[in-house]
């Protein structure tokens, strides 16, 4: 009887441990119910114009129109063929998935951001990008990202970009 009680306690302890551990990992990893991709995540606008609707269907009112091809957007929710997105300023709504691309772009957040030849603040500067420039996103280390725009390519501090998560690594 004593052995059965000890085994029962161990079983309960193991159950609680697994239940707690499972809850932690589920809270840390949020995925979209449609694509099973991480939420939030960044994408870009595939077209020159994209209607932003109040809800996830064609019957919902168009609140405004995004008018910048390749503009980075953050997906915060999914519903069927619709994605709730927001831009750098937090403006957003629901956009049909066909208007979005997985090609990653970023927005330059600081005026005249120096673009370096290597991920090093002492590396030669190959260009300077103005505030609001949209650039293609390449590799990212813990604090630098490689970007390209207007025929120029180089590295900028990740903190000068919108459209990439602070802890995101890319290669």
Q: Where are the predicted features?
A:
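SH3-family beta-barrel domains
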Residues: 26-54, 65-69, 76-79, 86-91, ...
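Bacterial N-terminal signal peptides that target proteins for export
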Residues: 1-12
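Intrinsically disordered, low-complexity polar regions and short flexible loop motifs
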Residues: 57
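Beta-strand-rich domains and repeat architectures in extracellular enzymes and scaffolds
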Residues: 61-62
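Cleavable N-terminal signal peptides
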Residues: 13-14, 24-25
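N-terminal signal peptide c-region/cleavage motif recognized by signal peptidases
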Residues: 20-22
């Amino acid at each position: 009887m004593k052995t059965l009680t000890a085994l029962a306690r161990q079983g309960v302890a193991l159950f609680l441990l697994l239940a707690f551990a499972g809850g932690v990992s589920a809270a840390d990893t949020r995925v979209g119910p449609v694509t099973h991709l991480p939420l939030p995540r960044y994408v870009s606008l595939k077209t020159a114009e994209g209607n932003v609707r109040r809800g996830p269907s064609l019957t919902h009112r168009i609140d405004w129109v995004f008018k910048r091809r390749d503009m980075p957007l953050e997906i915060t929710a999914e519903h069927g063929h619709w994605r709730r997105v927001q831009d750098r300023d937090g403006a957003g709504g629901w956009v049909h998935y066909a208007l979005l691309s997985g090609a990653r772009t970023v927005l330059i957040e600081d005026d005249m951001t120096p673009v370096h030849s290597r991920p090093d603040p002492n590396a030669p500067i190959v260009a300077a990008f103005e505030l609001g420039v949209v650039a293609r996103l390449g590799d990212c280390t813990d604090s630098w990202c490689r970007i390209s725009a207007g025929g120029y390519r180089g590295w900028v501090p990740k903190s000068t970009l919108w459209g990439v998560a602070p802890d995101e690594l890319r290669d």
